[in-house]
Structures are given as C-alpha cells and as structure tokens.
C-alpha cells in the first residue's frame, strides 16, 4: 500500500518499447510456446520494468501479455489473458455471479490493491476479436500506456519470423555479352 501512489503514477506514465515486437523465441519451459521479453523506457520508473509476451502453440488466439516491474514482489503489474480458464475474483465484496471472469480479460490492481480480472469496455465490444493478438495486444497496451518507439500508438506485433525468399548467389552475370546502347 505504501507504493500505491508510485504505482498509480507509473501506470499513467507512457512506457516505450522497440517496435515491431516479434514473438519468436522458444520458451525453455514450454517448447511449443514462443516468447518475447524486452525492457521498457519510462520517465517515471517503478523499479526495472519490462514487457513479456507468450504465444502458445504459435496460436495468435492463445497468448498472454504482461507488464512486469521488480518494485512488486510478484512483479506482475498488468496481465492480459486471451484464452484459457476463467479467473475467479474470490473477494467477499464482489457478488458471487460476478466473481467468474471468462477470457479474454485483463488482470489489474484495483483501488484496494488487489490483482483482479476484469473485462474492459474494449474487450466487451468484440470478445472473439479481442482474443486475437492483433486486437487484444493493443487493448493491453492501452491499459498499460505502452507505446512503440517514442510514438503514441501501440507497438506493432507479429508472431514468428516473416518468411523470406531464399537467395542463392550464382557465379555468372546474366547481363554478360548483352550490348546496352
């Protein structure tokens, strides 16, 4: 609770990361998952902060994104879950029918300092689309004030490497013997 004022200030401050984000590294604990982790630049720091993204089974509709900072022991400041089990906000002041929150949802701290799952208005507009990384990740970035390369838009994101056309160098000049007049 002592850090809550600093936390609120940090959450309202723009945070920047490199763009585009390419989620391509194999996760050591889960070989079928891809991950990305990168530090954030922030004018008002809250410990060392970074962004972490995991895409399971290379499925853009099964991802989680986290805003992390070591100023909290749990490190998780904000988390977006696009798929998986419902989350239960097991608190007496939340009515039982409202305690279960299906995916997609965002975990964020409320005014009482509890990390709870919520569906934002943007998620509720189209929950199926918000489950995908192309729509869900910008929603996460908006909640966390995360931008790409000193811009005011969320960073571009892609899963896996873009395919490349192989280049094979040949030892002959295709223009050899052609007269250019």
Task: Pin down the residues of each PLM region.
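An exposed acidic His-Trp-rich patch
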Residues: 64-127
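Acidic, proline/glycine-rich low-complexity IDRs
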Residues: 133-181
